[in-house]
Regions:
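Conserved alpha/beta-domain cores
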Residues: 2-134
Length: 134
């Protein structure tokens, strides 16, 4: 089944993740980026990993921190192999997808927004086809 409804859930709140599984959404996006305070990123990673260890019955994607933060690889490493895929914020082109794919073992990537001017320009200047894009 292709998910039609996606629910963003703060990665720092186990209670909200547990509740989200009964929301009726087709998939969850566990957010480690904007929904988590900078000083809570490491703890949120552990919280998301522990939630995924319970084997939720709903597909879960993880929105990692952007490549420019220096946090992306640790985000991916904490949940690799236990998610339906990843959401990469501020993606600016296929090279960014290549980096995420290398860390994730070619897990699917959900591309839902282009958030930077460079990314928008790249949409028109580059071929964005990538084997990991959903």
């Amino acid at each position: 089944m292709t998910p039609r409804s996606w629910l963003f859930v703060p990665g720092a709140s186990r209670r909200m993740m547990d509740k989200a599984t009964t929301s009726g959404a087709d998939a969850l996006i566990l957010d480690l980026e904007d929904a988590v305070a900078p000083d809570a990123k490491a703890e949120a990673r552990r919280t998301v990993a522990a939630f995924l260890d319970t084997g939720p019955a709903i597909p879960c994607f993880v929105r990692v921190n952007g490549l420019g933060t220096g946090l992306t690889e640790a985000d991916v490493g904490a949940v690799r192999g236990r998610v339906a895929g990843f959401v990469l914020p501020k993606c600016e082109g296929p090279r960014d997808l290549d980096r995420l794919s290398a860390w994730s073992g070619n897990a699917p990537v959900l591309a839902i927004a282009t958030e930077t001017v460079r990314g928008v320009r790249a949409l028109f200047a580059e071929d964005w086809s990538h084997p990991c894009l959903l």
